[in-house]
């Protein structure tokens, strides 16, 4: 067994407490490969932000659990090389669906795990989450639970519809499970196709599609039931239209890809909603840069020549999110 402290990682407990008190959110960026990790760490160090390196079950299988562990350790050392003596980096399992998956991650150095039992009947969700919490807390690993179901598709996570979190359940769930944070459903969705055009209205000034409002009343009700308790929002990519346009310009076929307006996320981050998950925006930034490079340099076959621009574009996006959306910049002394 490898404990996350041996890798120089931290859990989310103190990080979330500071974010709730300070009115900002911690960026939770999903990653699958070295270029994404490099971009995330460089952006976090240069903006002096704590950060969560988030890995789905599918990404862990793709990258290999052993290599992933060393990448996480390397991320800490890379941050120090970049000038941050005391980086705050979490390695988090996103959407763990079984106790065995969560245990495997805890045993291999993860500092935080999510157990997603939201698809189960309520009592089964409580029992599964509690089981993970009891194991994780032995090793000071923090646990994220979930109430409510998000629509959309992302890796193995798939649902045709969303179910809002019931505020009347949150006290019982948090108390009985002992979870350290709670992911809720207020209308966001996984993936780049969060809403259909029929669900949206057209902004007369910009001509862009505006999605239906999120259920902020649910968020407020949850906060009222659990004052100061760390709340998590999944499916929070904004799907930048400039990246979508670049992808489509150079041979892509992303039609009606619509995300969450960034101003909604910034307002949410001022509450107890202290962890905001972003995955699709990273994929879009990477894909846009790669497609553009291939179109402009069709003879190019050196991976460094197209993955380098992809890394730079992702870093730019991560910095923007940290500074302008989440407000977590400047929160580290480094």
Stretches with model-predicted labels:
Residues 1-27, 300-301:
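Generic N-terminal amphipathic, Lys/Arg-enriched alpha-helix
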Residues 53, 60-64, 265, 274-298, ...:
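Shared catalytic-loop signature of beta/alpha-barrel
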Residues 10-21, 34-59, 66-86, 95-230, ...:
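Alpha/beta enzyme core
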Residues 26-30, 91-92, 114, 231-233, ...:
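Short catalytic-loop micro-motif centered on adjacent basic/acidic residues
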Residues 235-238, 258, 278-282:
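Short acidic/histidine-rich active-site segments
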Residues 289-334:
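Extended, intrinsically disordered, low-complexity segments
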Residues 3, 24-32, 59-60, 305, ...:
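A short N-terminal beta->alpha junction/helix N-cap motif
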